[in-house]
Amino acid sequence: MNELVFFEIPKQNLKIQIVKKSDEILEQIRKESAETAVMPDVAQYYTDIYFPKAPSDRPYTFSSIVLSSDGKMAYGDNPSGPLIAKNNFLDPDGSLGDFWVLNVLRAYADGIIIGARTLLSEPGITCHVYEERLTRQRREVLGKKYQPCGVIVSLDGTDIPFDHYIFDVDPKEEYKLVIATSPRGAEYIMANSPLKHPVIGPFKTIEDVDHADLGELYTDFNAFPVIVTGQGENPDTKV
């Protein structure tokens, strides 16, 4: 089985330029935030980070995007996400800063959304927190689980590679992975996947989700729950 890879990113040469900072706005967000703890490495090498409290009807989502100086986020002949930053040969330290910030954002997240086609283009991707110190501070300072939950999203399940590296991570790593799809996607997964997939749902309304028992998601790391929303082959993103 596969093990998660960890390493410590050297921070002495991190190039992180804060373009604009408003202490007033930051303090307002901090007061309204569900969590106000700041990981020590983030405070030392970056700045305090706070996230707005999630609305009652949906999670708070954010993204990390790396662009080249001419505005490109991927190559036409190779859509793999990390290539733009990784191939910054003129300024490797800048590339390192991009990767560290990505790990910071992952460390603050409860879940990481992974498109099924991303798995197809990146055979070794896991979307866990690679930085060892951030992994530890995430648990000790933020009180979060060892790793954020991976959430694979697919309309109909047909584009999910069930032999991907991510589905064979050793349970001792405590890396949880779930799939979010439509009713038709769930049918396809149950008929074609060799893996263990407890089905949660289908959910047609937000109220259905509120009454669902999702507590067992983290009890079996050999299982990959399928969370079903919507109707037919159309999942309901609002749910």
Give, region by region, the residue ranges found by the protein language model.
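Short active-site-adjacent structural elements
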Residues: 235-239
